[in-house]
């Protein structure tokens, strides 16, 4: 009887099920809004290095700096299907294709010359408005890039395996599709010693697409870790200096952990992976950011800066 009385009192002390449900919904709404705000700000373009040493691939680089839009908060790849009707491409691919076509024109490019400069057009014509990569935007991008995609697909039989893989990379519309492509085309082939495939170039491009195109640096880092831990042969073939550069930039873009960056640089030194100019640019980005942090934020700031200086030496 005493136990029942105690239970009756404790039940009365709790709020009703309706108030519990409303309280749960209120807390769920707060946590959801907080997480979405944090995610959008974390993966915004503002967190990307403004002087990133690469664009998409080696043959897409033309020396122009990337101008970051300071007002962009939501990642553009979340709404990439809104501006193209009938055909969708990952964010960032259009400008890279423009640059690619300008450097490597196709045989029938003159017939479909929507991006060729026309001096007879008026000064305010969109065809005279240069993009920040120095190329003329096409008048009908949906049709232009749809036809271009068909042309690239038709060139597969005349292209190297790396070019074919790069074209497959550009067709990935989600990071999950990119992960599936990595699993089928790279990871499952790591045990094939006879396969004549430039593994380091393919891994570097896959990490770069994950890091810049889908703003998922942790996915890029997982690609690196999968190849590194697979076997000594896979590590030697795949983990070159450009791949380590992408790993360093992925760590800094994703979590800004200077100790992790130092760990990767130490791996390069121990395994005699020679640093290149891109490595020094990545270290300079890390050094500049750490040097601007408040002193109370990182107690070992001076020690980390001294170690980064050592890796900056030739």
UniProtKB/Swiss-Prot annotation:
GO molecular function, one term: translation regulator activity
GO biological process: mitochondrial translation; mitochondrial translational initiation; positive regulation of mitochondrial translation; RNA splicing, via transesterification reactions with guanosine as nucleophile
One GO cellular component, as annotated: mitochondrial matrix
Stated name of the protein: Mitochondrial translation factor 2
Region (Disordered): 111-136
Function recorded in the entry: Translation activation factor that as part of the MRH5C complex specifically recruits cox1 mRNA to the mitochondrial ribosome for translation initiation.
Superkingdom to which the source organism belongs: Eukaryota
UniProt subunit comment: Component of the MRH5C complex, composed of mrh5, ppr4, mtf2, and sls1. Proteins mtf2 and sls1 form a subcomplex that serves as a scaffold to bring mrh5 and ppr4 together. The MRH5C complex associates with the small subunit of the mitochondrial ribosome.
């Amino acid at each position: 009887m005493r136990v029942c009385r105690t239970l009756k009192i404790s039940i009365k002390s709790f709020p009703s099920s309706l108030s519990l449900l409303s309280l749960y919904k209120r807390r769920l709404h707060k946590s959801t809004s907080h997480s979405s705000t944090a995610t959008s700000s974390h993966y915004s373009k503002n967190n990307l290095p403004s002087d990133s040493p690469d664009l998409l691939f080696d043959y897409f680089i033309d020396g122009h700096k990337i101008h970051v839009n300071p007002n962009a908060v939501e990642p553009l790849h979340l709404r990439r299907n809104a501006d193209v009707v009938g055909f969708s491409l990952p964010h960032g691919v259009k400008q890279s294709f423009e640059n690619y076509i300008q450097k490597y024109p196709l045989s029938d490019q003159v017939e479909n010359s929507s991006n060729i400069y026309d001096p007879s057009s008026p000064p305010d014509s969109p065809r005279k408005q240069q993009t920040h990569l120095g190329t003329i935007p096409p008048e009908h991008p949906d049709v232009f890039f749809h036809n271009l995609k068909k042309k690239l697909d038709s060139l597969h039989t005349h292209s190297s395996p790396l070019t074919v893989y790069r074209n497959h990379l550009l067709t990935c519309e989600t990071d999950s599709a990119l992960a599936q492509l990595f699993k089928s085309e790279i990871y499952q082939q790591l045990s094939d010693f006879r396969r004549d495939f430039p593994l380091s170039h393919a891994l570097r491009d896959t990490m770069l697409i994950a890091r810049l195109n889908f703003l998922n640096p942790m996915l890029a880092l997982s690609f690196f870790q999968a190849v590194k831990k697979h076997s000594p042969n896979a590590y030697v073939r795949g983990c070159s200096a450009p791949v380590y550069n992408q790993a360093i930039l992925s760590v800094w873009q994703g979590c800004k952990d200077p100790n992790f960056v130092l760990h990767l640089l130490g791996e390069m030194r121990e395994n005699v992976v020679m640093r290149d100019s891109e490595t020094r640019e990545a270290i300079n980005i890390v050094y500049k950011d750490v040097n601007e942090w408040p002193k109370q934020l990182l107690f070992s700031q001076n020690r980390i800066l001294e170690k980064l200086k050592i890796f900056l030496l030739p």
